[in-house]
Amino acid sequence: VPAHEIGQCVVNELRRYGVDTKYLLRGGPRLGVYYCEKGASQRASKVIYDRAGSSIATAKAEEFDWDGIFEGADWFHWTGITPALGGEMPEACLQACKAAKEKGVTVSCDLNYRKKLWSREQAGEVMAKLLPYVDVCIANEEDAKDVFGIEAENTDINSGKLDHAGYISVARQIAQRFGCRKVAITLRGSLSASDNDWAGMLYDACLLYTSDAA
């Protein structure tokens, strides 16, 4: 985060919840932000990103002390939005994943594909290099298709139709292609721009766990 007062507000907010900020880097010109225009009825929500030139986007991969960061840690989670910010973030994520594995830290990742940040081709190329270091992959049917070309059979994303059997295939393909121990998939049945039915699925090798939609 930047070293000015706005950056300090971020640090203070994290500390408020007991988050250790010892290794949080300070520098760069500005804090990245985004704006959300909430949808209504059948009009979808709209997101506007304002992250160009932000502190995280301009950070250098070698600035992060991964050995120190992962000392005593047992879990490292990162999101697909981070490498999508460009610059040296893809390399920073790769170094982080490698360091975490060397320390015996469990690595989880949310694919979180955002087409406004990078193309499908860029996402597929970068994420394919990172996923082999991931133990737990969190995805949905759209991300799996956009990033890796993996589709849920008998499922229509646009209509919100859910078919659990199709998602088992998606989870299995991700696990087999990249060696992930577990794959979690969020299942959304779209009712309107503001109302959805949600369910979850966890694929663990040959075992499958699902929740009821709510």
Predicted segment positions?
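Conserved small/polar residues in nucleotide/adenosyl-binding loops
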Residues: Y209-A214
